């Protein structure tokens, strides 16, 4: 397993699920929209929102086709809800339909051009497509929205994206901003540790990965293996061996345990 990918996949699901739930719970976020009250909801809109909530639940369970079907029914009830198109974009992206996903995000932004949640998700979609410049643009637009409550997760997603692009200095800066906003966010700590490890800053990487591994229900084979490699590179082979044995005992069938057995600390 290469260093380049070591910490990234663990945070992706965390970031995406958070974006999805925030984007569907209360409608679009951002400036320039009229404040919505209960009287603004027609029967069709209320039915559509129920469908969207169901779709979000199915999506977080990995039932993407069922989620998409619920979104389609929401759009029958009300074809002008931006959060429905936002969620449809996520579902199509998860189903490997990038053109349909792109169309859905575009439609969502036509209806709510400054919705921070859609801008975040569209930025993350572009990152997955390795369309780095577009990802940067949409993340920046999301962060510009004055009432946006998801700045930490957008900084996290931006940091992950920049790390995938190989821009480690910028990735560290984005992840550090995310950490300042949400110091308890372990997805941020994991990815910051990974970036610092790749940059050779082992002492700081050790600080962040310990925050993750000190939480037993969060630590996994990936986090333990990163910690072991950090210790090995930091000149602490005994610490690396101790973490490797913990990895082998807890996750004996993992790729990371196999890499430890082969002494592949530098791969």
Role assignments for model-derived ranges:
Residues 43, 77, 111, 145-147, ...:
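Structural marker of alpha-solenoid helical repeat scaffolds
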Residues 18-43, 267:
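Bacterial Sec signal peptide processing site at the extreme N-terminus
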């Amino acid at each position: 397993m290469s260093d380049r990918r070591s910490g990234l996949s663990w945070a992706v699901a965390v970031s995406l699920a958070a974006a999805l739930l925030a984007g569907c719970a209360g409608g679009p976020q951002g400036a320039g929209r009229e404040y919505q009250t209960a009287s603004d909801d027609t029967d069709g809109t209320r039915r559509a929102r129920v469908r969207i909530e169901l779709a979000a639940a199915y999506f977080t369970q990995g039932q993407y086709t069922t989620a998409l079907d619920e979104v389609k029914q929401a759009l029958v009830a009300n074809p002008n809800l931006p959060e429905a198109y936002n969620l449809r974009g996520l579902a199509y992206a998860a189903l490997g339909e990038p053109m349909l996903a792109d169309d859905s995000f575009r439609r969502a932004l036509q209806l709510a051009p400054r919705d921070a949640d859609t801008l975040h998700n569209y930025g993350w979609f572009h990152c997955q497509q390795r369309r780095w410049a577009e990802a940067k643009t949409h993340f920046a637009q999301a962060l510009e929205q004055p009432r946006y409550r998801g700045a930490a997760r957008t900084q996290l997603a931006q940091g992950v994206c920049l790390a995938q692009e190989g821009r480690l200095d910028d990735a560290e800066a984005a992840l550090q901003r995310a950490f300042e906003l949400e110091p308890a966010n372990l997805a941020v700590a994991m990815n910051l540790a990974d970036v610092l490890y790749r940059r050779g800053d082992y002492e700081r990487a050790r600080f962040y990965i310990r925050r993750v591994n000190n939480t037993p229900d969060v630590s996994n084979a990936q986090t333990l293996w990163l910690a072991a490699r950090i210790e090995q590179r930091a000149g602490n082979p005994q610490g690396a061996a101790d973490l490797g044995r913990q990895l082998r005992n807890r996750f004996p069938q993992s790729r990371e345990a196999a890499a430890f057995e082969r002494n592949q600390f530098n791969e």
